[in-house]
């Protein structure tokens, strides 16, 4: 099943002419709402793979179900997605991987924390909560990563609490957080350089569209 339900679709469509990569390969929205089987059927038919594919349908699953509703144990897909709750907030905070803002790696709650040494926690929490985004609350948080960005340094930031998974708009939350931080802390915020010269940066690959990269004005 889709771990963050199959009922909600959000985000811009990936521009494959400019930003196709291992991050995103086909022109789909960031939060696509599909199951693994549905993705396989889509890729196979619409994008010319045309293999002999057989998908075993799930029993008793409906699109509005959260992973925890299935009663299945959470199997960690990657060390930095330790819980089902993390998979929800990942859609909102993974964009910071390509910036000099910490996305919480090096802590026990990766992707649920966002911060940097030059951010004032209480100030950022107050500002983000003022947007009244549905299903989320930003708690002021100081933390010190043990590895990754700012290892051993005290970071100010926020803990992203999802208060209602049914109304939480992960991608909208992502763009609001990004816009506010890159505007409020313009003297410090930076997009990391590309890993390969002449190629797009990780930030650009994750954003996937010039509409997001260059039109973050409101």
Language model feature labels by segment:
Residues 115-218:
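Conserved functional hotspot residues or short segments at active or partner-binding sites
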Residues 19-91:
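Conserved anion/nucleotide-ligand pocket segment
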Residues 18-22, 103-109, 151-160:
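Short acidic (Asp/Glu) and glycine-rich catalytic loops that position anionic groups and cofactors
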Residues 52-64, 108-116, 192-204:
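A short, terminal or domain-edge coil/loop segment
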Residues 3-19:
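Glycine-rich, charge-decorated loop segments at or immediately adjacent to ligand/cofactor-binding or catalytic sites
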Residues 61-64, 69-141, 145:
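Glycine-rich, aromatic-lined ligand/substrate-binding cores of catalytic
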Residues 2-8, 55-60:
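Short, surface-exposed recognition loops or helix-turn segments adjacent to catalytic cores
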Residues 8, 44-48, 182:
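Sec-exported extracytoplasmic/periplasmic mature domains
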């Amino acid at each position: 099943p889709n771990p963050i339900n199959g009922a909600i679709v959000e985000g811009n469509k990936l521009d494959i002419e400019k930003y196709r990569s291992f991050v995103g390969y086909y022109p789909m929205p960031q939060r696509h709402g599909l199951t693994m089987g549905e993705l396989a059927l889509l890729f196979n038919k619409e994008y010319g793979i045309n293999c002999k594919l057989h998908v075993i349908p799930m029993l008793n699953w409906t699109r509005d179900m959260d992973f925890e509703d299935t009663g299945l144990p959470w199997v960690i897909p990657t060390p930095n997605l330790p819980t089902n709750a993390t998979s929800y907030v990942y859609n909102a905070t993974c964009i910071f991987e390509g910036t000099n803002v910490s996305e919480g790696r090096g802590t026990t709650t990766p992707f649920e924390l966002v911060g940097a040494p030059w951010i004032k926690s209480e100030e950022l929490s107050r500002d983000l909560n003022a947007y009244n985004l549905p299903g989320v609350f930003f708690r002021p948080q100081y933390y010190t990563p043990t590895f990754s960005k700012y290892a051993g340094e005290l970071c100010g930031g926020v803990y992203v609490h999802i208060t209602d998974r049914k109304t939480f708009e992960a991608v909208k939350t992502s763009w609001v957080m990004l816009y506010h931080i890159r505007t409020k802390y313009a003297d410090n915020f930076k997009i990391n350089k590309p890993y390969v010269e002449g190629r797009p940066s990780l930030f650009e690959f994750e954003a996937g569209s010039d509409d997001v990269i260059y039109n973050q004005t409101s």
